[in-house]
Swiss-Prot record:
Its EC number is 2.4.2.4. This is Putative thymidine phosphorylase. Pfam families: Glycos_trans_3N, Glycos_transf_3, PYNP_C. Signal peptide: none annotated. PROSITE patterns: THYMID_PHOSPHORYLASE.
Length: 513
């Protein structure tokens, strides 16, 4: 311990079993012997130090000595894990000066254009967890007002450089990304084994759900382990030409994960922030060719063709700057893709498509083939225009299913439950007619309310899509849940608004049987 630390008040670290998300939180007793709580008022920012190890945290004060004693400093689970010192270690606690990069955040809020070094400083502090959630929100709101092209490039570069940077000894490394917002839509899990079976390299890293009922990583986790580190990831790709793993475990663009955790609840999703998020991870992942799926629809993230064009140009601009060949494709975002919404239900759809099951969702199959065909066109040895036919050949021959099983075997077994929720309720059509609309956002909300993705077997199974004829009382979809209270909440919300429109009329409580 340094002489400076020794002169400061010392407290013993104690782990508090409290999940505070991404924010570092420390707790002291109001009767602390080493600190004066009246000086360290609640929600103060403090610096915790032991030797050369330091961390900023938000300080809370408790009157419960059973939680934190007078000689203790409690660290919530995320802070305890990041600080990396054993329970009982002595630490010093002092008021923390705000990160110097906050001056740049204030400048952005006031309308100033930031320099590349200023953006780099902000991203470095974000990645080191030196910002509170309120400070992160301030940066996001400032950036949402406007962002120049130079600021965007600087943000992509800074976010890609602070985490793991993967490099592959292969000339063509393909990737695909969907901007999200569409329930189901588990095309990556179908196209990765198709592309890998052909022989192209596709090391797919995916996210977990934040505000949706399932991310690709949540769904793949039903079939295989996804918390794979970099060395093991490279072994899997060497053996299988591809993988389907959780990106958070390989630490690609960690600052982006922190920004997303705050911007999603605030519904901040500007074009520039979206492009910076996606492109920073693809740059860090070592991708040479990227296909971006832009679903277009009234309840999708992209509503109009003009919005899609603007987003396409932004992706191409950033891709050109960093040497990544970017292609965007506009797809149908009017309704969910596949029949399942929720990890287990979506995994069932994927395996049905790969297994050429006649009952597999045709929309998921066709979209996956279309996207896979575009990726296969990046193979210089494949005749131009034959990508779709090659993708279909690999699927129908069983080669894609065999490759998926190889990926699953190499990633290892999962401990996740694969059973569906035991509590089920059918939501039925209010009248005879034709389904004329489906609200993606509402179905996402209903599936989450039912327990997905925490309960992987919770969610929604769709029986009807846009254009289907229905009779009064015929099931539109089934809600699956494990917990009675979650089932009750989901059913109540569905009765209030089912998310379906029949002959142009929304289904409300009085119309549901």
């Amino acid at each position: 311990m340094s002489p400076v630390d020794a002169a400061r008040p010392q407290l013993k670290i104690r782990q508090i079993h409290l999940d505070t998300g991404r924010e570092n939180v420390a707790v002291i007793s109001r009767h602390s012997k080493a600190l004066r709580p009246e000086v360290f008022s609640g929600f103060s920012r403090v610096e915790i130090r032991r030797g050369n190890q330091s961390m900023l945290a938000t300080l809370l004060i408790t009157d419960d000595n059973a939680m934190v004693g007078p000689d203790d400093l409690g660290l919530a689970e995320p802070a305890f894990r990041r600080f990396g010192e054993a329970a009982g270690s002595l630490v010093s606690v002092t008021p923390a000066s705000p990160p110097a990069s906050l001056d740049a955040v204030r400048g952005k809020i006031q309308g100033r254009t930031l320099t590349a070094p200023e953006i780099e400083a902000i991203v470095n502090d974000l990645a080191r967890y030196r910002y509170s959630d309120m400070e992160i929100a301030a940066f996001l709101i400032g950036a949402a007002r406007f962002m120049t092209s130079d600021e965007l490039l600087a943000l992509v570069s800074a976010m890609a450089s602070v985490g793991t940077q993967l490099r592959w000894d292969r000339p063509v490394v393909v990737d695909k990304h969907c901007i999200g917002g569409i329930p189901g839509n588990r095309t990556s899990m179908v196209l990765v084994p198709i592309v890998a079976a052909h022989g192209l390299t596709i090391p797919k890293t995916s996210s977990r759900a934040i505000t949706s009922p399932a991310g690709t990583a949540d769904t793949m986790e039903v079939l295989a382990r996804v918390d794979v580190g970099v060395p093991e990831m490279k072994e899997i790709v060497a053996a299988c030409n591809g993988c389907l793993i959780w990106g958070g475990h390989v630490n690609l663009s960690p600052a982006d994960d922190i920004l997303i955790s705050v911007e999603r609840p605030l519904c901040l999703d500007t074009r520039e922030q979206m492009v910076a998020s996606i492109m920073s991870k693809k740059l860090a992942a070592g991708s040479t060719h990227l296909l971006v799926d832009l679903p277009l629809g009234p309840s999708a993230k992209v509503i109009s063709p003009i919005d899609a064009m603007r987003l396409r140009k932004l992706f191409e601009f950033v891709g050109d700057h960093f040497g990544i060949a970017v292609e965007t494709i506009t797809t149908d975002g009017r309704q969910p893709i596949g029949n399942g919404i929720g990890p287990v239900l979506e995994a069932q759809d994927v395996m049905a498509v790969l297994g050429n099951d006649p009952k597999a969702p045709a929309d998921l199959r066709e979209k996956s083939l279309r996207l896979a065909g575009h990726l296969l066109e990046y193979d210089p040895n494949l005749r131009g225009g034959s990508g779709y036919a090659r993708a279909r050949e690999l699927l129908e021959s069983g080669a894609a299913l065999k490759q998926m099983q190889k990926i699953i075997d190499n990633q290892g077994p999962t401990n996740c439950r694969k059973d569906l929720g035991t509590l089920t309720t059918d939501i039925v059509a209010p009248r005879d007619g034709v389904v004329t609309g489906i609200d993606n956002l509402q179905l996402n909300r209903l599936a989450r309310t039912a327990g997905a993705p925490i309960d992987k077997g919770a969610g929604i199974k769709l029986f009807k899509k846009v254009g289907d004829r229905v009779e009064q009382g015929e099931p539109l979809y089934r809600i699956y849940a494990f917990d009675p209270s979650e089932q009750e909440l989901a059913v109540s919300a569905a009765e209030e608004s089912s998310g379906y429109t029949v002959d142009g009329v929304h289904a409300f409580r009085e119309q549901v049987l």
